[in-house]
Amino acid sequence: GRKMKKYVKRLEAIMLGITMLFSMPFSGTAMAAGKTSANQMTVKTHTAQTTAVEDAESPKTTFPVHVIHKTGNDKENFVIVIMGDGYTAQQQDQFVKDATQKAQGMLTWSPYKEYSDRINIYAIQTISNETGISEYGGKSVDSYFHLRLFGKAIGFSNGGDQKAKDLREEMEKKYLDAGASVGTIHILSNTNGDFGASINSLFSFSTNSEDNSSGTAMTHEVSHSIGGLGDEYERYTNKPNTSATSD
């Protein structure tokens, strides 16, 4: 039934996140712990060119949907949806360009590159009234998802998460191939500040910063969401070291 389908889909996501998304060898302990570093396991490979599919008509969806990368049926492939925040109606062409550039960049990293034929990527052209991002205790921007900066992290405010969930449901019911579901959502904030976050398996965030111009930050944050990975930084050691060289 529906519950079993969701369970199978989650297993597929875990397989992508743990056994497919990380091509370097693991120790048995690292595999069991599921705490591998997103920094550590994302390995750059030679550049591959992604062929974008022509936009499909989406008259039944609230916002236009742009097909960035589709290689097979949505039910069989892992579906990534990119949504914009802080992009006004006049900036939608820029959003599509930004989302496409970052998604194509992500598909040049292993093992996304090797499994690119099992991944479909779409962009939903959500429209904000104002450009930019709000700051906790500071400026307020009227953006669609009401994203807000909390120090170096990004999060929802004022019900923005429910808006994203509603758009996911709409995609699943009215746009994707029959029986398909969205695997994860990445929200791209129209600000040049260098921020990012992943709050669970469904949502991750990055910005339109120079460091993220080729999707490096997006790849990092999406890997947190799909693989359930923890950071391993010399300056940030609250996660256990689970590298292949650790005891």
Task: Kindly label every feature range from the protein language model.
Residues 4-15:
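Bacterial N-terminal signal peptides that target proteins for export
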Residues 200-247:
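The catalytic-center signature of Zn2+-dependent metalloproteases
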Residues 179-193:
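Short, well-ordered secondary-structure micro-motifs within conserved domains or adaptor modules
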Residues 14-22:
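Gram-negative bacterial Sec-dependent N-terminal signal peptides
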Residues 79-84, 120-123, 184-188, 217, ...:
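Structural recognition of the beta-strand scaffold that forms the well-ordered cores
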